[in-house]
Amino acid sequence: MRQRTIVCPLIQNDGCYLLCKMADNRGVFPGQWALSGGGVEPGERIEEALRREVREELGEQLILSDITPWTFRDDIRVKTYADGRQEEIYMIYLIFDCVSANRDICINDEFQDYAWVKPEELALYDLNVATRHTLALKGLL
């Protein structure tokens, strides 16, 4: 089984949290709402990976004004690729509290939508199990 270290930003701006709706046909949680993030490449520093993933998934214009390591966890997930293949992966999540200086988002094709959500409205979204766990651990659910 392959192992991946995943950097995952919990991005907050003006009291709201950024959620991204995964594409329906790929990813670990197709069609569900999630936090952004992705894998650390070999030789890449963790904060560099976090900033790269934010740029790739959310666009160059989103500015993170604060990044603080928060917690970590692990689990085993099945990833679905765009061609329909599936793979079981051992995932190590490094989760960061992040504050953005703006809300300028340009999502890539991994996502079909995004939303800035007030804490009291987070439970209304179809959150994947990992995001639900993270938000509950943070006291937001």
From Swiss-Prot:
Reaction(s) catalysed by this chain's protein: a ribonucleoside 5'-triphosphate + H2O = a ribonucleoside 5'-phosphate + diphosphate + H(+); a 2'-deoxyribonucleoside 5'-triphosphate + H2O = a 2'-deoxyribonucleoside 5'-phosphate + diphosphate + H(+); dUTP + H2O = dUMP + diphosphate + H(+); dTTP + H2O = dTMP + diphosphate + H(+)
Task: Please give one Gene Ontology molecular function term for this protein.
Answer: dCTP diphosphatase activity
* Domain Nudix hydrolase: from-to ranges: 1-141
Q: What class of enzyme is it?
A: hydrolase
Origin: domain of life: Bacteria
Q: Where is the signal peptide?
A: none
Motif position, Nudix box: 38-59
Q: Which UniProt keywords apply?
A: Hydrolase, Magnesium
Instruction: Look up the EC number in the record and give it.
Output: 3.6.1.9, 3.6.1.12, 3.6.1.-, 3.6.1.23
Cofactor(s) it depends on: Mg(2+)
The record's comment on protein family reads:
Belongs to the Nudix hydrolase family. NudI subfamily.
Assembly notes: Monomer.
Protein function? Catalyzes the hydrolysis of nucleoside triphosphates, with a preference for pyrimidine deoxynucleoside triphosphates (dUTP, dTTP and dCTP).
Q: Which PANTHER family match?
A: GDP-MANNOSE MANNOSYL HYDROLASE, MUTT_NUDIX FAMILY PROTEIN
Name-wise, this protein is: Nucleoside triphosphatase NudI
Q: Which organism is it from?
A: Salmonella schwarzengrund (strain CVM19633)
**What gene name is given for the protein in this entry?**
nudI
